[in-house]
Amino acid sequence: MEPQLNQEVINTAAQHDGPIETDAVIVGAGPVGLFQVFELGLLEIKAHVIDSLAYPGGQCIELYPDKPIYDIPAVPMCTGKELTDSLLKQIEPFGATFHFGQEVSVVEKQEDGRFFVETSKGTKFLTKTIFIAAGVGAFQPKLLRVDGLDQFDNTQLFYRVKNPADFAGKNLVIVGGGDSALDWALNFVAEGPNKAESVILVHRRDGFKAAPASVAKMKELCDAYEMQFIVGQVTGYDEKNGKMTGAKVTGADGVTRVVPLDVLLVFFGLSPKLGPIAHWGLDIERKQLMVDTEKFSTNIPGIFAVGDINTYPGKKKLILSGFHECALAAFGAAPFIFPDKKIHLQYTTTSPKLHKVLGVESPVFD
Protein backbone atom coordinates (compact mmCIF):
# COMPACT_ATOMS: atom_id res chain seq x y z
CA MET A 1 0.00 0.00 0.00
CA GLU A 2 2.86 2.39 0.73
CA PRO A 3 4.33 4.43 -2.15
CA GLN A 4 7.59 3.16 -3.55
CA LEU A 5 10.63 5.36 -4.00
CA ASN A 6 12.54 5.07 -7.25
CA GLN A 7 16.17 4.02 -6.87
CA GLU A 8 17.40 7.50 -7.82
CA VAL A 9 15.34 8.96 -5.00
CA ILE A 10 15.98 6.50 -2.21
CA ASN A 11 19.80 6.95 -2.22
CA THR A 12 20.12 5.68 1.32
CA ALA A 13 22.94 7.24 3.29
CA ALA A 14 26.31 5.55 3.13
CA GLN A 15 28.22 4.83 6.29
CA HIS A 16 30.02 7.89 7.61
CA ASP A 17 32.75 8.04 10.22
CA GLY A 18 31.55 11.52 11.20
CA PRO A 19 28.38 13.55 10.70
CA ILE A 20 26.88 13.91 7.23
CA GLU A 21 27.56 17.49 6.11
CA THR A 22 24.68 19.03 4.17
CA ASP A 23 23.00 22.30 3.33
CA ALA A 24 19.51 21.34 4.48
CA VAL A 25 17.76 18.79 6.68
CA ILE A 26 14.00 18.41 6.29
CA VAL A 27 12.13 16.87 9.21
CA GLY A 28 9.01 15.20 7.81
CA ALA A 29 8.35 13.41 4.51
CA GLY A 30 4.69 14.28 4.10
CA PRO A 31 3.47 16.24 1.05
CA VAL A 32 4.83 19.55 2.36
CA GLY A 33 8.20 18.05 3.30
CA LEU A 34 8.46 16.47 -0.16
CA PHE A 35 7.59 19.74 -1.88
CA GLN A 36 10.22 21.48 0.24
CA VAL A 37 12.75 19.21 -1.49
CA PHE A 38 11.48 20.59 -4.82
CA GLU A 39 11.65 24.26 -3.87
CA LEU A 40 15.14 23.85 -2.42
CA GLY A 41 16.19 21.89 -5.48
CA LEU A 42 15.25 24.75 -7.78
CA LEU A 43 17.77 26.85 -5.83
CA GLU A 44 20.36 24.03 -6.17
CA ILE A 45 20.13 23.16 -2.49
CA LYS A 46 20.27 19.43 -1.77
CA ALA A 47 18.49 18.01 1.22
CA HIS A 48 18.37 15.06 3.58
CA VAL A 49 14.86 14.09 4.71
CA ILE A 50 14.11 12.42 8.06
CA ASP A 51 10.77 10.83 8.97
CA SER A 52 9.59 8.68 11.86
CA LEU A 53 7.45 6.58 9.53
CA ALA A 54 8.92 3.78 7.43
CA TYR A 55 7.78 5.34 4.16
CA PRO A 56 7.06 8.77 2.60
CA GLY A 57 3.68 10.47 2.56
CA GLY A 58 3.08 11.40 6.19
CA GLN A 59 -0.55 11.81 7.22
CA CYS A 60 -1.69 11.37 3.60
CA ILE A 61 -0.50 7.77 3.65
CA GLU A 62 -0.98 7.06 7.35
CA LEU A 63 -4.55 8.37 7.58
CA TYR A 64 -6.20 8.56 4.17
CA PRO A 65 -4.19 6.81 1.42
CA ASP A 66 -7.33 5.96 -0.55
CA LYS A 67 -9.56 8.92 0.33
CA PRO A 68 -10.10 11.57 -2.36
CA ILE A 69 -8.47 15.01 -2.07
CA TYR A 70 -10.18 17.74 -4.07
CA ASP A 71 -8.28 20.96 -3.27
CA ILE A 72 -4.91 20.51 -5.00
CA PRO A 73 -4.62 23.14 -7.78
CA ALA A 74 -5.07 21.74 -11.32
CA VAL A 75 -5.74 18.25 -9.89
CA PRO A 76 -9.53 17.84 -9.67
CA MET A 77 -9.18 14.72 -7.53
CA CYS A 78 -6.42 12.47 -6.25
CA THR A 79 -5.90 10.12 -3.33
CA GLY A 80 -3.29 10.61 -0.63
CA LYS A 81 -1.19 7.87 -2.21
CA GLU A 82 -1.49 9.37 -5.70
CA LEU A 83 -0.45 12.79 -4.40
CA THR A 84 2.56 11.26 -2.65
CA ASP A 85 3.58 9.28 -5.73
CA SER A 86 3.33 12.41 -7.91
CA LEU A 87 5.46 14.44 -5.50
CA LEU A 88 8.10 11.68 -5.39
CA LYS A 89 8.25 11.75 -9.18
CA GLN A 90 8.46 15.54 -9.19
CA ILE A 91 11.46 15.61 -6.83
CA GLU A 92 13.41 12.81 -8.54
CA PRO A 93 15.82 15.21 -10.30
CA PHE A 94 17.07 16.55 -6.97
CA GLY A 95 18.34 13.26 -5.50
CA ALA A 96 17.25 13.83 -1.92
CA THR A 97 18.47 11.30 0.64
CA PHE A 98 15.79 9.76 2.85
CA HIS A 99 16.22 8.46 6.40
CA PHE A 100 13.05 6.62 7.40
CA GLY A 101 11.99 5.10 10.70
CA GLN A 102 13.84 7.61 12.86
CA GLU A 103 13.07 10.78 14.81
CA VAL A 104 15.32 13.78 15.32
CA SER A 105 16.39 13.58 18.96
CA VAL A 106 19.12 16.25 19.18
CA VAL A 107 19.49 19.71 17.62
CA GLU A 108 22.44 21.84 18.76
CA LYS A 109 23.70 25.13 17.33
CA GLN A 110 27.45 25.03 16.59
CA GLU A 111 30.00 27.84 16.86
CA ASP A 112 30.29 28.05 13.07
CA GLY A 113 26.53 28.69 12.76
CA ARG A 114 25.60 25.22 11.58
CA PHE A 115 23.37 22.77 13.44
CA PHE A 116 24.36 19.38 14.79
CA VAL A 117 21.44 17.00 14.31
CA GLU A 118 21.19 13.43 15.59
CA THR A 119 18.38 10.93 15.12
CA SER A 120 17.01 8.16 17.31
CA LYS A 121 19.04 5.67 15.24
CA GLY A 122 22.28 7.58 15.74
CA THR A 123 22.47 9.17 12.28
CA LYS A 124 24.34 12.48 12.64
CA PHE A 125 24.35 15.61 10.48
CA LEU A 126 25.99 19.01 10.31
CA THR A 127 23.58 21.23 8.42
CA LYS A 128 23.31 24.91 7.58
CA THR A 129 19.51 24.92 7.73
CA ILE A 130 16.64 22.87 9.14
CA PHE A 131 13.10 22.73 7.75
CA ILE A 132 10.49 21.33 10.11
CA ALA A 133 7.62 19.88 8.07
CA ALA A 134 6.42 17.43 10.68
CA GLY A 135 2.67 17.94 10.26
CA VAL A 136 0.99 17.67 13.65
CA GLY A 137 4.13 16.08 15.05
CA ALA A 138 4.31 12.44 16.02
CA PHE A 139 0.66 11.45 15.95
CA GLN A 140 -0.59 8.52 18.01
CA PRO A 141 -4.06 6.97 17.88
CA LYS A 142 -6.32 7.60 20.84
CA LEU A 143 -6.71 4.23 22.53
CA LEU A 144 -9.76 2.34 23.72
CA ARG A 145 -9.12 2.07 27.47
CA VAL A 146 -10.29 -1.36 28.57
CA ASP A 147 -8.16 -3.41 30.97
CA GLY A 148 -6.36 -6.24 29.19
CA LEU A 149 -7.57 -5.28 25.72
CA ASP A 150 -4.09 -4.32 24.53
CA GLN A 151 -3.08 -8.01 24.44
CA PHE A 152 -5.00 -8.21 21.16
CA ASP A 153 -3.15 -5.29 19.50
CA ASN A 154 -2.50 -5.99 15.82
CA THR A 155 -4.12 -9.44 15.99
CA GLN A 156 -7.77 -8.65 16.68
CA LEU A 157 -7.58 -5.00 17.78
CA PHE A 158 -6.60 -2.35 15.22
CA TYR A 159 -6.51 1.45 15.21
CA ARG A 160 -5.93 1.80 11.47
CA VAL A 161 -6.48 -0.18 8.29
CA LYS A 162 -3.33 -0.79 6.29
CA ASN A 163 -4.66 -3.54 4.04
CA PRO A 164 -8.46 -3.79 3.69
CA ALA A 165 -8.15 -7.33 2.31
CA ASP A 166 -7.05 -8.50 5.77
CA PHE A 167 -10.59 -7.88 7.05
CA ALA A 168 -12.55 -9.45 4.19
CA GLY A 169 -15.03 -12.10 5.31
CA LYS A 170 -14.63 -11.18 9.00
CA ASN A 171 -17.22 -10.19 11.59
CA LEU A 172 -16.23 -6.60 12.37
CA VAL A 173 -17.13 -4.31 15.23
CA ILE A 174 -16.14 -0.73 14.37
CA VAL A 175 -16.03 1.85 17.17
CA GLY A 176 -16.16 5.62 16.59
CA GLY A 177 -18.28 8.44 15.21
CA GLY A 178 -15.94 10.32 12.88
CA ASP A 179 -15.14 10.07 9.19
CA SER A 180 -12.70 7.17 9.56
CA ALA A 181 -15.20 4.99 11.44
CA LEU A 182 -18.03 5.69 9.01
CA ASP A 183 -15.88 5.44 5.88
CA TRP A 184 -14.49 2.04 6.84
CA ALA A 185 -17.89 0.76 7.93
CA LEU A 186 -19.34 1.67 4.53
CA ASN A 187 -16.27 0.25 2.79
CA PHE A 188 -16.57 -3.14 4.44
CA VAL A 189 -20.33 -3.37 3.84
CA ALA A 190 -19.97 -2.62 0.12
CA GLU A 191 -19.87 -5.43 -2.42
CA GLY A 192 -16.36 -6.25 -3.54
CA PRO A 193 -13.23 -8.20 -2.62
CA ASN A 194 -12.99 -6.54 0.82
CA LYS A 195 -16.60 -7.13 1.89
CA ALA A 196 -16.87 -8.24 5.52
CA GLU A 197 -19.12 -11.03 6.76
CA SER A 198 -20.84 -8.54 9.08
CA VAL A 199 -20.34 -4.95 10.25
CA ILE A 200 -21.57 -3.50 13.55
CA LEU A 201 -20.88 0.18 14.25
CA VAL A 202 -20.69 1.26 17.90
CA HIS A 203 -20.75 4.93 18.96
CA ARG A 204 -21.41 6.45 22.37
CA ARG A 205 -24.23 8.65 21.07
CA ASP A 206 -26.57 9.02 18.11
CA GLY A 207 -24.79 12.14 16.83
CA PHE A 208 -21.77 11.94 14.52
CA LYS A 209 -18.84 14.12 13.49
CA ALA A 210 -18.66 12.33 10.13
CA ALA A 211 -19.90 13.73 6.83
CA PRO A 212 -23.73 13.87 6.79
CA ALA A 213 -23.85 11.88 3.55
CA SER A 214 -21.91 9.04 5.18
CA VAL A 215 -24.21 9.06 8.21
CA ALA A 216 -27.28 8.96 5.96
CA LYS A 217 -25.83 6.06 3.97
CA MET A 218 -25.04 4.15 7.17
CA LYS A 219 -28.61 4.55 8.44
CA GLU A 220 -29.96 3.47 5.06
CA LEU A 221 -27.85 0.29 5.23
CA CYS A 222 -29.05 -0.37 8.77
CA ASP A 223 -32.68 -0.04 7.63
CA ALA A 224 -31.89 -2.59 4.91
CA TYR A 225 -30.38 -4.95 7.55
CA GLU A 226 -26.98 -4.86 5.80
CA MET A 227 -25.22 -3.60 8.93
CA GLN A 228 -26.05 -2.63 12.52
CA PHE A 229 -25.57 0.50 14.61
CA ILE A 230 -25.49 0.33 18.41
CA VAL A 231 -25.45 3.36 20.73
CA GLY A 232 -23.08 2.51 23.56
CA GLN A 233 -19.49 2.12 24.68
CA VAL A 234 -17.16 -0.87 24.71
CA THR A 235 -16.54 -1.60 28.39
CA GLY A 236 -15.09 -5.10 28.24
CA TYR A 237 -14.63 -8.22 26.16
CA ASP A 238 -15.20 -11.96 26.17
CA GLU A 239 -12.25 -14.27 25.66
CA LYS A 240 -11.88 -17.98 24.95
CA ASN A 241 -8.61 -19.90 24.52
CA GLY A 242 -6.63 -16.65 24.27
CA LYS A 243 -8.86 -15.22 21.57
CA MET A 244 -11.31 -12.33 21.83
CA THR A 245 -14.77 -13.62 20.93
CA GLY A 246 -16.94 -10.62 21.70
CA ALA A 247 -17.07 -6.99 22.81
CA LYS A 248 -19.12 -6.00 25.85
CA VAL A 249 -21.12 -2.92 24.87
CA THR A 250 -22.86 -0.90 27.60
CA GLY A 251 -25.78 1.15 26.30
CA ALA A 252 -27.31 4.37 27.57
CA ASP A 253 -29.81 2.23 29.46
CA GLY A 254 -26.97 0.77 31.52
CA VAL A 255 -27.46 -2.70 30.08
CA THR A 256 -24.33 -4.49 28.85
CA ARG A 257 -24.65 -6.76 25.84
CA VAL A 258 -22.02 -9.02 24.26
CA VAL A 259 -21.48 -8.43 20.55
CA PRO A 260 -19.70 -11.35 18.80
CA LEU A 261 -16.71 -10.42 16.65
CA ASP A 262 -13.58 -11.53 14.86
CA VAL A 263 -11.96 -8.09 14.77
CA LEU A 264 -12.37 -4.84 16.72
CA LEU A 265 -11.55 -1.66 14.76
CA VAL A 266 -11.27 1.55 16.82
CA PHE A 267 -11.25 5.05 15.32
CA PHE A 268 -11.15 7.65 18.09
CA GLY A 269 -8.90 10.05 16.19
CA LEU A 270 -5.29 10.99 16.76
CA SER A 271 -3.47 12.69 19.59
CA PRO A 272 -0.78 15.00 18.15
CA LYS A 273 2.48 15.17 20.07
CA LEU A 274 5.40 17.44 19.22
CA GLY A 275 7.82 14.95 20.73
CA PRO A 276 11.48 16.08 20.84
CA ILE A 277 10.66 19.24 18.82
CA ALA A 278 9.16 20.70 22.00
CA HIS A 279 12.63 20.81 23.57
CA TRP A 280 14.57 22.56 20.79
CA GLY A 281 14.11 26.09 22.18
CA LEU A 282 11.55 27.10 19.56
CA ASP A 283 8.67 29.47 20.27
CA ILE A 284 5.55 27.31 20.59
CA GLU A 285 1.88 28.26 20.72
CA ARG A 286 -0.66 25.48 21.34
CA LYS A 287 1.71 22.76 20.15
CA GLN A 288 2.57 24.66 16.97
CA LEU A 289 5.72 26.53 15.98
CA MET A 290 5.46 30.29 15.64
CA VAL A 291 6.90 31.68 12.39
CA ASP A 292 7.10 34.93 10.48
CA THR A 293 5.24 35.03 7.18
CA GLU A 294 8.06 36.53 5.13
CA LYS A 295 10.45 33.58 5.33
CA PHE A 296 8.58 31.12 7.58
CA SER A 297 11.52 31.29 9.94
CA THR A 298 11.20 30.30 13.58
CA ASN A 299 12.72 32.33 16.40
CA ILE A 300 16.02 30.50 15.76
CA PRO A 301 17.72 31.80 12.58
CA GLY A 302 18.29 28.95 10.15
CA ILE A 303 15.37 26.86 11.38
CA PHE A 304 12.18 27.11 9.32
CA ALA A 305 8.74 25.55 9.83
CA VAL A 306 6.25 24.80 7.05
CA GLY A 307 2.88 23.06 6.87
CA ASP A 308 0.56 22.08 9.70
CA ILE A 309 3.35 22.28 12.31
CA ASN A 310 3.47 26.10 12.16
CA THR A 311 1.15 28.90 13.22
CA TYR A 312 0.74 32.58 12.32
CA PRO A 313 -2.18 35.03 12.07
CA GLY A 314 -4.66 33.74 9.51
CA LYS A 315 -3.05 30.29 9.28
CA LYS A 316 -5.10 27.70 7.39
CA LYS A 317 -4.13 24.03 7.65
CA LEU A 318 -4.26 23.22 3.95
CA ILE A 319 -1.78 21.31 1.80
CA LEU A 320 -2.03 24.23 -0.63
CA SER A 321 -0.88 26.67 2.07
CA GLY A 322 2.03 24.40 2.96
CA PHE A 323 3.24 24.37 -0.65
CA HIS A 324 3.24 28.19 -0.71
CA GLU A 325 5.19 28.28 2.56
CA CYS A 326 7.85 25.96 1.09
CA ALA A 327 8.69 28.43 -1.67
CA LEU A 328 9.17 31.38 0.70
CA ALA A 329 11.10 29.25 3.20
CA ALA A 330 13.51 28.09 0.48
CA PHE A 331 14.27 31.68 -0.53
CA GLY A 332 14.54 32.62 3.13
CA ALA A 333 17.13 29.89 3.67
CA ALA A 334 19.27 30.71 0.63
CA PRO A 335 21.38 33.41 2.38
CA PHE A 336 22.44 30.86 5.02
CA ILE A 337 23.70 28.54 2.30
CA PHE A 338 24.94 31.04 -0.30
CA PRO A 339 25.85 34.11 1.80
CA ASP A 340 27.74 35.80 -1.04
CA LYS A 341 25.29 35.01 -3.80
CA LYS A 342 22.27 37.06 -4.84
CA ILE A 343 19.32 34.77 -5.52
CA HIS A 344 17.07 35.81 -8.38
CA LEU A 345 13.54 34.55 -8.91
CA GLN A 346 13.39 32.41 -12.04
CA TYR A 347 10.50 30.65 -13.73
CA THR A 348 10.41 26.98 -14.70
CA THR A 349 8.64 27.94 -17.94
CA THR A 350 11.49 30.05 -19.32
CA SER A 351 14.70 29.56 -17.34
CA PRO A 352 17.36 27.43 -19.13
CA LYS A 353 19.14 27.12 -15.77
CA LEU A 354 16.08 25.60 -14.12
CA HIS A 355 15.51 23.37 -17.13
CA LYS A 356 19.03 22.01 -16.64
CA VAL A 357 18.42 21.48 -12.91
CA LEU A 358 15.17 19.66 -13.71
CA GLY A 359 16.81 17.57 -16.42
CA VAL A 360 14.45 18.76 -19.17
CA GLU A 361 15.10 20.34 -22.56
CA SER A 362 14.54 24.06 -22.96
CA PRO A 363 11.76 24.74 -25.46
CA VAL A 364 12.61 26.51 -28.71
CA PHE A 365 10.15 29.23 -29.66
CA ASP A 366 9.75 30.38 -33.26
Swiss-Prot record:
The protein's required cofactor(s) are namely: FAD
GO terms, molecular function: ferredoxin-NADP+ reductase activity; flavin adenine dinucleotide binding; NADP binding
Q: List the disulfide bonds.
A: none
Q: Which reaction does it catalyse?
A: 2 reduced [2Fe-2S]-[ferredoxin] + NADP(+) + H(+) = 2 oxidized [2Fe-2S]-[ferredoxin] + NADPH
Q: Which UniProt keywords apply?
A: FAD, Flavoprotein, NADP, Oxidoreductase
Q: What domain of life is recorded for the organism?
A: Bacteria
Q: Which residues bind FAD?
A: D51, Q59, Y64, V104, F139, D308, T349
In the UniProt record, the signal sequence range is none
EC number of the protein? 1.18.1.2
Q: Cofactor note, please?
A: Binds 1 FAD per subunit.
Q: Which Gene3D superfamilies match?
A: FAD/NAD(P)-binding domain
InterPro entries per UniProt? FAD/NAD-bd_sf, FAD/NAD-binding_dom, Fd--NADP_Rdtase_type_2, Ferredoxin-NADP_redctase_2
Q: How does it assemble?
A: Homodimer.
Sequence similarity:
Belongs to the ferredoxin--NADP reductase type 2 family.
HAMAP family xref list: FENR2 (MF_01685)
The cross-references to PANTHER family, in alphabetical order and at most eight, read:
THIOREDOXIN REDUCTASE 1-RELATED-RELATED (PTHR48105)
Kindly provide the name given to this protein in its UniProt entry: Ferredoxin--NADP reductase
The species this protein was found in: Polaromonas sp. (strain JS666 / ATCC BAA-500)
